[in-house]
Regions:
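RNA substrate-binding interface of SAM-dependent RNA methyltransferases
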Residues: 2, 50, 104-108, 112-168
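Glycine-rich phosphate-binding loops that contact phosphosugars or nucleotide phosphates
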Residues: 101
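Boundary-proximal intrinsically disordered activation/regulatory segments immediately upstream
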Residues: 1-67, 153-154
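Short loop/helix-cap segments at secondary-structure boundaries that form the rim of catalytic
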Residues: 67-75, 111-113
Length: 168
């Protein structure tokens, strides 16, 4: 079961995954180094958990707890409960969707999976997060098996790419 922790100090080290989410360069190094990505909003958080991405922690305002309580019941994870003002101080932006989760990255496809796929979208060096998200959304919408991105492409698990791919 989740452990709920009230936090009122923006410098609390337990909030490190959520600091300065607007700084793309900082996020790239932090997320790659720690193997994490940030899911924003209840819909995205649920979808990530359902897809098998394990959460590291959650950051949310009190009014969002009940809407995610069923998800928390099955997880052994820390839920940092903060005011909306504190969430904005920590993240660097107004958290419109009220809930954030630090999620563990995983390798989703093996070479054998790629070889077995009938239809793949292959993208080389698409560097805009919104474009990557739109490509993923379109590929899913027309029933393609997956999207293969070149190493220099924008991160498909960056917040903006995720929001675009889900239409949120």
């Amino acid at each position: 079961m989740a452990t709920f922790i009230d936090i009122d100090d923006p410098a609390d080290p337990r909030l490190a995954d959520y600091v300065n989410l607007r700084d793309v360069n900082l996020r790239k190094s932090l997320e790659a180094e720690h193997g994490l990505f940030i899911a924003e909003g209840a819909k995205v958080i649920r979808r990530a958990c359902e897809a098998g991405y394990p959460p590291r922690s959650f950051l949310l305002a009190p009014r969002w707890i009940d809407g995610l309580r069923d998800l928390f019941d099955g997880l052994d994870v820390e839920v940092f409960v903060v005011s909306e003002t504190l969430a904005e101080q920590v993240t660097g932006f107004h958290v419109h969707r009220g809930a954030l989760a630090s999620m563990c990255r995983q390798t989703r496809w093996s070479a054998a999976d790629l070889m077995a796929a009938r239809r793949l979208v292959v993208c080389e060096d698409i560097v805009d997060h919104t474009n990557v998200g739109a490509i993923i959304r379109c590929a899913a919408g027309i029933g393609w098996d997956g999207v293969l991105l070149a190493p220099r492409a924008a991160d498909p698990l960056y917040r903006r790419a995720i929001k675009t791919s889900m239409g949120t």
